[in-house]
Structures are given as structure tokens and as C-alpha cells.
Amino acid sequence: MSKSALDPVEFLKGALEIPSPSGKERLVAEYLAEGMQKLGLKGFVDEADNARGQVGEGPVQVVLLGHIDTVPGQIPVRLEGGRLFGRGAVDAKGPFVAMIFAAAGLSEEARKRLTVHLVGATEEEAPSSKGARFVAPRLKPHYAVIGEPSG
């Protein structure tokens, strides 16, 4: 599938349709990793069930981290008036999907200067923070962006 064949709204809608309460993120992680691969990124699921991606081969390390778990409960997924609704649309599958598409759009020049690591972390909504704790000792970025909404 070409980069242009993966629609960001449809991709996010698909992620929202996969329930992923804390501790049960594996299916959405696999979906996101597959999407990253379709966009030309190295996409995979790690031992903590984080959805992970990487692009670029440069010396400057950047982490783009969002979480892919949600609080329990269902919100019907719907597109209404140009807005997408569903559990995780804002907190925080939406920000992570935006990060995926931003990374996929990096220029060749940027890919030579940067290595961008994408982390769709598990269990952020739980006290364990399993996903972030797993990657913290493994990634030593120069810069990090956390895709977490604020009140």
C-alpha cells in the first residue's frame, strides 16, 4: 500500500474501534505497527506491547510518545461534522496517530539528521505505566514530545 493510500482519519477511526483498556492493548498495538509499516516506517510491537516505530538514521534522537490504552467504557465511534468521536480520540490515540503521520512525512534531509522513535505506550491509564517504564532505559533521546492532552 502506498503512503497516500492510508487515510489518517480512517486509520485513526480503525484504532478507535479496537478496545484497548489498560493491560489489553495488544490488538491496537498490532494495528498501529502495521499502519506504520504501510507508511514506510519500521513498525513493530515490543515486549511490553507498545506500538513502536522508527524512521531516520541520523545522530539526533527524538522520541514521539503517546499512549494507546484507554480508560474502561465505550463511546460509539462516529464521524460527525468533520469531528471524530470515540474512546481514545483525544486521550490519546489521536495524538499518537498524528505523530505517526508526522514522522512518515519527514523529508529525506531530516531522515539523515534525525532518528525518530515512535512509542505508543501501554498502561498509561494504570499506575504501572508499563509501556513508558519499558522504553525509558532503552531510549536516550536528545528531545521528546509527549502527546498527552491537558485540561
Where are these regions (language model features)?
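Phosphate-binding glycine-rich loops and adjacent basic patches that engage nucleotide phosphates
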Residues: 1, 14, 60-65, 93-98, ...
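Short, conserved micro-motifs enriched in small and acidic residues
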Residues: 86-97, 122
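Residues at alpha-helix caps and immediate loop-helix transition turns in enzyme cores, especially N-
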Residues: 28, 76, 95, 128-131
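Acidic/histidine-rich catalytic neighborhood of metal-dependent amide-processing enzymes
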Residues: 97-151
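Acidic/His- and Gly-rich active-site-bordering loop/insert found
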Residues: 1-89, 111
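Generic detector of well-ordered alpha-helical packing
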Residues: 68-70, 92, 124-125, 149
